[in-house]
Amino acid sequence: MSNYNKPIQLLCVLVVVLFFINNQFVQRTTWSRGLRSPPLDSRIFQEKSEIERSTLPPIPKGFLSSKLASTARLANHIFELVSVYGMAKSLNRKPAIFVEDSKYNLLITGVRKVLPGLLDEFQIFEYPVHNKATKVPLSEKCCIFDNPDKFNNISSEYLHLTGHFYQSWKYFDKYKEKVQSFVKPAIDFSPLPNSDSSNFISRICIHIRRTDFVDGQHHSSNVSFIKPALEFIKEREQKDVNKKMLTVIMGDDPDFEAKMFEGTVRAKKEAKIEETTKYFVSENTPQDDLAYSHYSCDATLITAPSSTFGWWLGYLSKGQAVYYQDIRSTNDVNYKKGVLDPDDFFVPSWTSIMLDENKKVVVVT
């Protein structure tokens, strides 16, 4: 190789090196300025991570619990726990139960028999609420909505409500689909009829309390309203005249219920069901009655308007065609004393009915 060519080769190598250095500098500069896109697989991973982060629920900022009316009945327990669940979600907290005594365990067991999914949402502490909890009053009147959003700025890990009952759809109705999914799986409800393509079940929800609902203060169920109300519902809800309409009656006084309609069958396991049978009295547990409503009741009639059990039969029902006797047309003590606001207690999509002066059923708007 001649001495003449060597400088040229060195010059060429130098040019290549300088080009490489300059190219690396440009790449780093554009990367730092965000002008260069990362490789496709990196972008896909980054976008996926951002989507996952945006769809993850926020981390709860603590627990929400409440004093519970442990000596009350099943439907009152359901109201309290579902409302605490709804409020906890709205306040970005985990619903919790502090077990104060053995009655709390009975409460939990009773609700779990019909809404097992609801209890799965709760953190259950096997001891009373501790001193670290911030206690706040809410809903001093059972059936008037008290907006819990006022507690949004409380940062305490444990927020404990000292109200009771929380009987308003407004505490949880935006989570209605989820609440209904908490109902236990269907079981064999026979000899009660199931809702299928060949029949229509008009569900009468009767919760007659012979202990206190006939005390002259609460409005209890009575035949003079039930019979015309049922006929009214049949006319409104029967979409196909060829369908067989059946009525299932549920309540706390089977003897009374069995006498309302001729040919009524008390649906015990050994009961003989004729093809012509149209009226059934349930002999199931309250939990199974609620589950039956969820899977089979196309229409529901609540004849004792302040009955919380009747309320839940309607709210959990399959068909969501719920009718109730207008409480303003009665002398029910809860309404008269101002502890129940109909707009807070009754779901707006439900139909309020009453008897006019001619004993004709009319819709109350």
From Swiss-Prot:
Classification via PANTHER family: ALPHA-1,2-FUCOSYLTRANSFERASE-RELATED, UNCHARACTERIZED GLYCOSOL TRANSFERASE-RELATED
Record-annotated membrane-spanning stretches: none
Record-level GO BP terms: carbohydrate metabolic process; macromolecule glycosylation
Entry protein name: Putative glycosyltransferase C06E1.7
Top-level EC class as recorded in UniProt: transferase
Highest taxon above the source species: Eukaryota
Enzyme Commission numbers on file: 2.4.-.-
UniProt record similarity statement: Belongs to the glycosyltransferase 11 family.
Pfam families attached to this UniProt entry: Glyco_transf_11 (PF01531)
Record InterPro entries: Alpha-1-2_FucT, Glyco_trans_11
One GO cellular component term noted in the UniProt record for this chain: membrane
Molecular functions (GO terms): galactoside 2-alpha-L-fucosyltransferase activity
Keyword terms of this UniProt record: Glycosyltransferase, Transferase
